[in-house]
């Protein structure tokens, strides 16, 4: 499963991309507003940070004609742009039109298998089920992912399932186990995913042992101790 980051804050993208785990970025009008930046400028900067990565940029028009025009304009900003469209009749119409011109699309705000199938038939590159928001209704967001993926596999549908509305690391695990092709993850959740108390405890133990071996404080890195480290397993 690929990882996208769900943000329009360039510093967050830069930090997580340095880990070597990102395949793309998703944005939406709310995230762009929160960033306080010009939309086109942000997309260009993201493209430089994540070369080759998919960058979802959402249209704001509500009618098909407006979505198509805006989608073409946004797609022209950079070859990495994926035009993000709402899962509405107008959004499906725009998806079909943009796809026919070779423009990649991400149909978002998906909350059911029938909706996902419609997006796929309209030619969507990605369809984005909202895991967290489905959970909020009392249904199981990860089960929705599983059912969509099963339907796509059975129908030999190439549209990728992009798990969105990720709230915590367990949502990422659930999406992976349900067969999602991509999870778009907020910065905060990435920082939660990388941490585990046993990892830090193990590191502290290794460094304390190293300090004893070298007669140095635990803060002294091996490179400054002057001798070869003794490898301790377990």
UniProtKB/Swiss-Prot annotation:
Gene Ontology, cellular component aspect: cytoplasm
GO annotation terms (biological process): carbohydrate metabolic process; pentose-phosphate shunt
Subcellular location, principal: cytoplasm
Keywords recorded for this protein, A-Z: Cytoplasm, Pentose shunt, Schiff base, Transferase
A GO MF term: aldehyde-lyase activity
Paired cysteines (S-S): none
Pathway the protein contributes to: Carbohydrate degradation; pentose phosphate pathway; D-glyceraldehyde 3-phosphate and beta-D-fructose 6-phosphate from D-ribose 5-phosphate and D-xylulose 5-phosphate (non-oxidative stage): step 2/3
CDD domains, per database record: Transaldolase_FSA (cd00956)
Chain segments carrying region Disordered: 212-234
E.C. number: 2.2.1.2
SUPFAM superfamilies: Aldolase
Pfam hit, one: TAL_FSA
Domain of life: Bacteria
Catalytic activity: D-sedoheptulose 7-phosphate + D-glyceraldehyde 3-phosphate = D-erythrose 4-phosphate + beta-D-fructose 6-phosphate
Protein task: Transaldolase is important for the balance of metabolites in the pentose-phosphate pathway.
Family: Belongs to the transaldolase family. Type 3B subfamily.
PANTHER family membership: FRUCTOSE-6-PHOSPHATE ALDOLASE 1-RELATED, TRANSALDOLASE
Name of the featured protein: Probable transaldolase
Species for this entry: Deinococcus radiodurans (strain ATCC 13939 / DSM 20539 / JCM 16871 / CCUG 27074 / LMG 4051 / NBRC 15346 / NCIMB 9279 / VKM B-1422 / R1)
Annotated gene: tal
């Amino acid at each position: 499963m690929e990882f996208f980051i769900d943000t329009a804050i360039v510093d967050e993208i830069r930090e997580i991309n340095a880990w070597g785990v990102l395949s793309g970025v998703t944005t939406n009008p709310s995230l762009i507003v929160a960033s306080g930046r010009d939309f086109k400028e942000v997309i260009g900067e993201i493209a430089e940070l994540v070369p080759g990565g998919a960058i979802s940029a959402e249209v704001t028009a509500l009618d098909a004609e407006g979505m198509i025009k805006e989608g073409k304009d946004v797609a022209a900003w950079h070859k990495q742009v994926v035009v993000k469209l709402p899962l509405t009749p107008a959004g499906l119409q725009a998806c079909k039109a943009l796809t026919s011109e070779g423009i990649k699309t991400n149909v978002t705000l998906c909350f059911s298998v029938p909706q996902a199938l419609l997006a796929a038939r309209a030619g969507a590159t990605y369809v984005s089920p909202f895991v967290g928001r489905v959970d909020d209704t009392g249904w199981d967001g990860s089960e929705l992912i599983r059912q969509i993926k099963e339907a796509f596999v059975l129908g030999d549908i190439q549209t990728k399932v992009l798990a969105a509305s990720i709230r915590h690391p367990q949502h990422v695990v659930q999406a992976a186990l349900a067969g999602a092709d991509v999870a778009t993850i907020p910065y905060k959740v990435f920082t939660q995913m990388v941490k585990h108390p046993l990892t830090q405890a193990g590191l502290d133990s290794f460094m304390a042992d190293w300090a004893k071996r070298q007669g140095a404080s635990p803060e002294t890195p091996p490179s400054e101790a002057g001798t070869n480290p003794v490898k301790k397993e377990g």
